[in-house]
Amino acid sequence: MNIFSGIEYKVLKDVNLDRKYDGIEYDSRKIKENYIFVAFEGANVDGHNYIDSAVKNGATCIIVSKKVEMKHNVSYILIDDIRHKLGYIASNFYEWPQRKLKIIGVTGTNGKTSSTYMIEKLMGDIPITRIGTIEYKIGDKVFEAVNTTPESLDLIKIFDKTLKKKIEYVIMEVSSHSLEIGRVEVLDFDYALFTNLTQDHLDYHLTMENYFQAKRKLFLKLKDINNSVINVDDEYGKRLYDEFIVDNPEIISYGIENGDLEGDYSDDGYIDVKYKNQIEKVKFSLLGDFNLYNTLGAIGIALKIGISMEEILKRVSNIKAAPGRFEALDCGQDYKVIVDYAHTPDALVNVIVAARNIKNGSRIITIFGCGGDRDRTKRPIMAKVAEDLSDVVILTSDNPRTESPEQIFDDVKKGFIKSDDYFFEPDREKAIKLAINMAEKNDIILITGKGHETYHIIGTKKWHFDDKEIARREIVRRKMVENVN
């Protein structure tokens, strides 16, 4: 098959271009003998600067998105808008593995990761590939995630490996960014779940309308829009549902307040699940409406796949939180420490409200920060949320990246109404220690922002930093001091 089939390209230099190639990469460090190197301009790195390195490593064909000096004895191909075309080249090279798979796409501001984990759980023994923020999993093999939705070339490689392992289903998080820049352009989805849409990524999308339109693209990529599952308690979900339901009557709507599929907390440790006028009481160990919403969405997808409600509800009882999602750390202390990925205003509301509902809880001590080089408009909103809903607030650092930490903190502080009624500790490790040392019996410490992440980004460098690791260490240290005294 011609790997350039279906796309416009211009041959700048032909050196045995029709040869059979052994691989394709956009990272020059991964290039081997007789590989194709794809050079494109990323947000921080321009691949055209690494052509020499790629050729040195064995590249025999260079795909460029702008004219360059052709000083090597290799083929050069010019392709405009290569980020959108890379998926076609990769698909041609790997013979379109995605067409032989059933792909479940999950999109929304919050809940994508938890939903993919829950869908996997509800599918029981069906082997799956799962792609998302925390990790990429192919059968029983787990790989570190680079992006929520990988580059199109990496996606196609994952699909190729999935097929070779005889796995049929792929569950993947689909970010708005990936929908906008073409990472999923060559995919047609079999099922799609919409969790919610709240403020985030406005540094990229600029407006909520643009953000919504990006998410909406997933549903236009469905083979059959009837295989949608949509949260209609969310205003944008309701809008999506209202648009599509007229011509697609089999869409499943869900929610706590409205929907074909409804759920609510009932007795302690149980939820009621209502579907087609049947109500079932199910044991449920997770706290917070956000976990209930994610579970309902996962149930909807499982139903669409063809799993019986009876089988689904048996598995609901065994659902556990994804790593770093409202994850409790138990080191024998008499106060609670919970780590959560919440880094948007809505997610912060959800975790604090969930903490409030914990039985015998006392004060809520919330640690939060805001990432650098990201949506600045959400920063004061998060401060207001933390102040309004918490008893104690500790403002700290959370991946400042290349932005001035002082600028980030200044933006955040504008949201505090009581100007001095919070703790400010820019050193995140010290902030965690401060919270643990001030905690009293039955207090609940919420360490938000990083969740599963094990790094802190300062400038362009990642430093090892694990909220859970530090919190456990400080809990144990405090207990040792108390035992001595």
Swiss-Prot record:
Enzyme Commission number(s) of this protein: 6.3.2.13
UniProt-annotated location(s): Cytoplasm
UniProt cofactor(s): Mg(2+)
Record's GO cellular component terms: cytoplasm
Modifications the protein undergoes after translation, according to the UniProt entry: Carboxylation is probably crucial for Mg(2+) binding and, consequently, for the gamma-phosphate positioning of ATP.
Gene3D superfamilies: Mur ligase, C-terminal domain, Mur-like, catalytic domain, MurE/MurF, N-terminal domain
Catalytic activity from the UniProt record: UDP-N-acetyl-alpha-D-muramoyl-L-alanyl-D-glutamate + meso-2,6-diaminopimelate + ATP = UDP-N-acetyl-alpha-D-muramoyl-L-alanyl-gamma-D-glutamyl-meso-2,6-diaminopimelate + ADP + phosphate + H(+)
Record-listed N6-carboxylysine modification sites: K215
KW DNA damage (keyword) present: no
SUPFAM superfamilies per UniProt: MurD-like peptide ligases, catalytic domain (SSF53623), MurD-like peptide ligases, peptide-binding domain (SSF53244), MurE/MurF N-terminal domain (SSF63418)
Metabolic or biological pathway, per its Swiss-Prot or TrEMBL entry: Cell wall biogenesis; peptidoglycan biosynthesis
Annotated binding of UDP-N-acetyl-alpha-D-muramoyl-L-alanyl-D-glutamate, by residue: S28, N147, T148, T149, S175, R183
Keywords attached to this entry: ATP-binding, Cell cycle, Cell division, Cell shape, Cell wall biogenesis/degradation, Cytoplasm, Ligase, Magnesium, Nucleotide-binding, Peptidoglycan synthesis
Amino acids binding meso-2,6-diaminopimelate: R374, D398, N399, P400, R401, G449, E453
Job description of the protein: Catalyzes the addition of meso-diaminopimelic acid to the nucleotide precursor UDP-N-acetylmuramoyl-L-alanyl-D-glutamate (UMAG) in the biosynthesis of bacterial cell-wall peptidoglycan.
PANTHER family for the chain: MUR LIGASE FAMILY MEMBER, UDP-N-ACETYLMURAMOYL-L-ALANYL-D-GLUTAMATE--2,6-DIAMINOPIMELATE LIGASE MURE HOMOLOG, CHLOROPLASTIC
Family classification: Belongs to the MurCDEF family. MurE subfamily.
Record protein name field: UDP-N-acetylmuramoyl-L-alanyl-D-glutamate--2,6-diaminopimelate ligase
Lineage, broadest ranks: Bacteria, Fusobacteriati, Fusobacteriota, Fusobacteriia, Fusobacteriales
